[in-house]
Amino acid sequence: MFTVLILEDDTEQQKAITKILEEHYNKWILYTAATYKEACNLIETKNFDLFLLDIELNTAYIDDLDCDGLDFGKYIRSIKKYTYAPIVYLTALPDRIFFALQELHCSSYLVKPYTAYKLIETLDYIYR
């Protein structure tokens, strides 16, 4: 089975992404996290094929860790089995994408607000 980790602190965004993926990729297994800490706990217990990461996480939900989606991307890349795993960043801050592309070698990114069509198109491109 194809397994996806969605790191998104906005619950409405998280639900929307999950709904889109469930409708278009109904055999995928989806896990969601709202914080860096939750995402770290999941990555330690599950195996993932794809990561969808919000760059800017609400610091009120970070559990005393001053970390964001870019930090989680660095953590992913530090794990040998995820060296080349696809990462798609979701952001309202396109100026931070350069780091994700250059340093973390993310597969793609989407600038918020994006459409369901654009999300599906991006994922289809990665996995065609």
Segments from the language model and where they lie:
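Non-catalytic signal-transmission and effector/linker regions of two-component phosphorelay proteins
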Residues: M1-L5, T11-T18, Y127-R128
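Acidic di-acidic motifs
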Residues: E8-D9, A92
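Two-component/phosphorelay signaling modules centered on CheY-like receiver
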Residues: D10-K37
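Acidic, metal-coordinating helix/loop segments flanking the phosphotransfer/catalytic sites
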Residues: T18, T32-L50, N58
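Short amphipathic alpha-helix used as the core "switch/output" element in two-component signaling
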Residues: I62-T83
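Hydrophobic/aromatic residues positioned on beta-strands within the core alpha/beta folds
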Residues: V88-L90
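As written
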Residues: Q102-L110
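C-terminal output helix
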Residues: Y114-L123
